[in-house]
């Protein structure tokens, strides 16, 4: 059973990578901030970050990468539907102000984030989750047939590994 799970996981990863190669224009892979900072970005004029939990400091450990700190000064820095995923605490406000004042355009997903950023003098707008940018026909063009499961299952989506949550999900599935 363990081998079957490994094979299924490899198959899913291959399909995901094929999707990225077919539909997303990717740069080479970077593994740390210094690699990004030392790159020559001569042909790039806009840097964009955003979406799911990208500015949740608890998940990203306040990593500079998510605030585009590596981008050259003469480029445009922007976010699209950047998500904090939680309420912005008073202690986090100075950090966000220092990082986001460098951005040219900011959009966030949560209304609460928009309001908190306005309170600290950061202009931004609220945008929808990017998953809603495509219509049904566009999504169907990219979809594949998935065989129907032979038995009921529970789908678990975790932002970070959690043995406690996995135990709850396994208990629920019984």
Language model: regions and residue ranges:
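Short intrinsically disordered, low-complexity coil segments enriched in acidic
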Residues: 1-5, 134, 174
């Amino acid at each position: 059973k363990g081998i079957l799970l490994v094979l299924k996981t490899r198959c899913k990863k291959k399909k995901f990578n094929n999707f990225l190669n077919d539909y997303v224009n990717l740069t080479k892979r970077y593994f740390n901030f210094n690699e990004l900072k030392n790159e020559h970005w001569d042909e790039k004029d806009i840097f964009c970050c955003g979406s799911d939990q990208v500015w949740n400091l608890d998940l990203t450990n306040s990593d500079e990468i998510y605030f585009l700190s590596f981008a050259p000064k003469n480029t445009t820095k922007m976010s699209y539907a950047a998500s904090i995923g939680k309420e912005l605490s008073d202690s986090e406000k100075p950090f966000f102000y220092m990082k986001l004042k460098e951005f040219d355009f900011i959009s966030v997903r949560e209304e609460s984030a928009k309001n908190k950023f306005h309170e600290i003098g950061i202009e931004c707008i609220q945008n929808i989750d990017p998953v809603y940018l495509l219509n049904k026909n566009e999504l169907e063009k990219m979809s594949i047939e998935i065989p129907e499961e032979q038995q009921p299952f529970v789908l678990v989506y975790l932002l970070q590994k959690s043995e406690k949550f996995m135990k709850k999900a396994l208990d629920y599935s019984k």
